[in-house]
């Protein structure tokens, strides 16, 4: 069987943050905004914005101190896809990044 890779690296601004105590650790779920700049066929600058769902558990290389709305963060992790059935009976998917490393950056980093 060939080796597979599930790796994500993101740097962007934090949106909403929910921090909650967990057994033996602190967990954070937050949204992260990344932006990609490109040019249209006519040469106009376009900014493509993407919101990501992130789950992080403090410890190891995950540092949650200073994680607030607007913070600039850099993280690496993996994608996790969960399927569930909504109240109306439709099948839904929830995609999130589970952080292995997370650092709140200073503005000049």
Identify the residue ranges that each predicted region occupies:
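Single-stranded nucleic acid-binding surfaces, predominantly the OB-fold ssDNA-binding core
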Residues: 1-109
């Amino acid at each position: 069987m060939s080796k597979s890779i599930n790796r994500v690296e993101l740097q962007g601004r934090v949106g909403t943050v929910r921090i909650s105590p967990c057994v033996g650790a602190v967990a954070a779920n937050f949204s992260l905004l990344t932006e990609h700049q490109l040019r249209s066929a006519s040469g106009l600058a376009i900014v493509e914005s993407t919101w990501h769902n992130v789950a992080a558990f403090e410890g190891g290389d995950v540092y949650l101190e200073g994680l607030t709305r607007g913070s600039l963060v850099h993280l690496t992790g993996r994608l996790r896809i969960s399927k569930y059935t909504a109240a109306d009976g439709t099948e839904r998917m929830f995609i999130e990044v589970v952080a292995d490393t997370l650092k709140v950056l200073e503005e000049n980093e």
